[in-house]
Every structure is written in C-alpha cells, then in structure tokens.
Amino acid sequence: SVNIQEVVVTGEKNIVEKTQTSMIEVPIEQIKTIPALLGEVDVSKAIQLLPGVQSSEGSSGFYVRGGGPDQNLILLDGVPVYNASHIGGLFSVFNADAIKTVRLTKGGFPARFGGRLSSVLQIDMKEGNMKEFRGDATIGLISSKLTLEGPIFKDKTSFIVAGRRTYADLFVKPFMPESTDLTLYFYDLNAK
C-alpha cells in the first residue's frame, strides 16, 4: 500500500465577467492604410467597412443593425458630434492626423450612452508630444493638412493642433458663373 498526502485544491472565479463582444477598436494606423477617395483618409468610410455596418453610396453616414445614421451616437473625446460630415456627406469632419483611437460599439452599450439605438462611435484625439516640438505637413489632391504638437511644460502637459483645408473651390471656380458667391470648400481645426 502507498500513503498519499492530502491534496487541497482551491480556486477563484469572478462571478461577473465584463466582456464587450460587440465593440470593435480600429487603430488609426490601420485606417490610414485603407484606399481613400482622392487620397483623403476618412474615418467614417473606414467604419463603413466593418462587419455589421452598412453604408450608402457617396455619404459618410452609416447604418448599424437596421437603424438610420441618426441612431448612431458619435463622440469626439466624449463630446457628441451632431453633424459628422462635410459637402453633403462626401468627407467626414475627423482629421486622421489628430486621432488616436476609434471604437465602434454595435449593441449592448452602457446606459450612459443613451438616446441612440444603433451604435456608439467613440473617437479619441491624440495627446501632444511631451518631449519635443514636432510638425507634419501634407499636400494632397483635394486638401492640405498641417499638424503641430509639443510640450507646454516638458513631461507634464502638451498641445496638439491639426488643421485641414480643401481647395476644391479652385477647381470649381472656372465652371461657376461670375455672378455667384458660392464657394465649395471646407476647413477643420482640431486642438487639444
């Protein structure tokens, strides 16, 4: 016969596990690799490519689980954005150079996001560079962008300013009657 010592088995399990199966986080680096209309990176168009999201042609609005574009709560750093597009929905108001993360929750979102039925799109802006001043400039087919960032107090607080302006008005102007004051352009300024 063999004597065996007593074996004690203990275990722990959380009674409630927190999982969000309907939340998708898309890194901005991945969004920047998606082919874009006239080279203009568009966060809203990238969201339209996700599973469970439908789009309409030529518009930055998106449909989630049968709801309309007005049933999506869009937040920029926690602040609601009510009109998230320019030029009738061709371009979104979000400058990809100023964005850090994009998260889409397609259902089962917390009550604090009330007032919408379909989804919550959370967009967080980048923090400025805490170590050194830095700038980026981009000239594209339809717009130009400038981003400046740096420390206000080194390693404590920082700033980021990102601006974008289209120059579609320069292309359209020769085809417009001289008597009209109609211009076709937009500009954005994001600062944090």
What would you call each of these model-derived segments?
Residues T33-P35, V79-K106, L184:
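Short acidic/polar hinge/loop motifs at secondary-structure boundaries
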Residues P35-N83, K100:
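Extracytoplasmic beta-strand/coil segments of soluble accessory domains associated
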Residues S1-P35, S44, P69-Q71:
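Short, acidic, small-residue-rich periplasmic hinge/interaction motif at the N-terminus
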Residues Q5, D70-N72, A98, K131-G135, ...:
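Outer-envelope beta-barrel architecture signal
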Residues H86, E132-R134, F175-T180:
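Extracellular loop and loop/strand-boundary signature of outer-membrane beta-barrel proteins
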Residues S1, V43-A46, F62, G89-N95, ...:
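N-terminal periplasmic accessory domains that precede
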Residues G140-R165, E178-K192:
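Transmembrane beta-barrel wall of Gram-negative outer-membrane proteins
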Residues S55, R116, M130, A137-L141, ...:
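Transmembrane beta-barrel outer-membrane domains
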